[in-house]
Amino acid sequence: MYYPFVRKALFQLDPERAHEFTFQQLRRITGTPLEALVRQKVPTKPVTCMGLTFKNPLGLAAGLDKDGECIDALGAMGFGSLEIGTVTPRPQPGNDKPRLFRLVDAEGLINRMGFNNLGVDNLVENVKKAHFDGILGINIGKNKDTPVENGKDDYLICMEKVYAYAGYIAINISSPNTPGLRTLQYGDALDDLLTAIKNKQNDLQVIHHKYVPVAVKIAPDLCEEELIQVADSLLRHNIDGVIATNTTLDRSLVQGMKNCQQTGGLSGRPLQLKSTEIIRRLSLELKGQLPIIGVGGIDSVIAAREKIAAGATLVQIYSGFIFKGPPLIKEIVTHI
C-alpha cells in the first residue's frame, strides 16, 4: 500500500503543515472523479445506535476535519460515519503555533489547537455541498472568549444552525485546550447545560419535524466519583449517547519521549488503555441504557474490538488514522 511512502514524506513536515497540505489535496479531489484515488470498498456491517443506522461501526473522530471541508473525500475511504468540528458560533484562530506535536515512538499526538475553525455558518455551507451517504456528526463547542458561565449559549447557537444538517450532534465539553471548558462536565454546571440542550433539542424537533440525537463527549481524566456523576446526569436528562473519550492530560506513559512535556491533550496509543477503562466503567454505570461511542488510541482491529468488548457500540479513529492511513479503515471494518 502506498501510505507508508506518503507518511514518510508528510512526517518530514511540521505536523500542522502536513495536515494543511493533506487537506489541500483532499479539497482538490473532493466531489470530483479524482475521489477514486482515495476510494476503498469496505464491507457493509450495519449497526444501530442512537436510533440511527450506521453502515459500519467505524467513524472518524472530531478534530481532523474541523470545518467540513473534505467530507466526500474522507467518506470515500470507507468510514461509516464522520464527525466534523469542533465548530464554534464565531470563527476563531485557536492557540498560538506550534500547537500540534508528534510523539513518533509512542504513535501519539499532543495538540493544543484551541478550537481553531472558520465558524458554524461556514461549516453549514460546506455540509450543504457534500454528498456523503454515511452518518454525519457535527461536534460543537464554545468560543474561547465566551465566559464559561455563558457557555451554554454558544452550544445552543450552534445546535440551532446545524440541526437540519446533522445526523447527530456532539457536545464537546472535554477539550483541555479551551480554558474552563472541562468544568462544564461537573455538578450543577453540567445539569444546567444538559437541561438547556435537551430543551433546545425538543424545540428543534418540532420545527424541523425530525429528531437529531445528541451525544456528549467526555474526558478520560475523570475520577470514579466524577464518572458516576456524569453517567447519572446523562441518564437523567435523556441524552442520546456518550463519546468516550477526548484527549488526556496524563503523561505517565510517555515520560522521557520527545515532545512529551508539551502542554495540550495527548491522543493515540498512549491513550488506548485509559480510554478503554473509562468505557468499561461507564458501561457498568449506564447498564445499556445509553450507547457509548468509543474513541482513544484505536490503531488496530484488536484495539477496536477491545473498545467494543468494554461496552462501545461504535468506534472512532483519529491519531491511528494519521499513523496508519486509509488501510486502517479497511482493516478495522473488514475484521471487526
UniProtKB/Swiss-Prot annotation:
Its EC number is 1.3.5.2. The active site is at S175. It catalyses: (S)-dihydroorotate + a quinone = orotate + a quinol. Keywords: Cell membrane, Flavoprotein, FMN, Membrane, Oxidoreductase, Pyrimidine biosynthesis. It is found in: Cell membrane. The keyword Oxidoreductase applies. Coiled coil: none annotated. InterPro entries: Aldolase_TIM, DHO_dehydrogenase, Dihydroorotate_DH_1_2, Dihydroorotate_DH_2, Dihydroorotate_DH_cat, Dihydroorotate_DH_CS. Its cofactor is FMN. Catalyzes the conversion of dihydroorotate to orotate with quinone as electron acceptor. This is Dihydroorotate dehydrogenase (quinone).
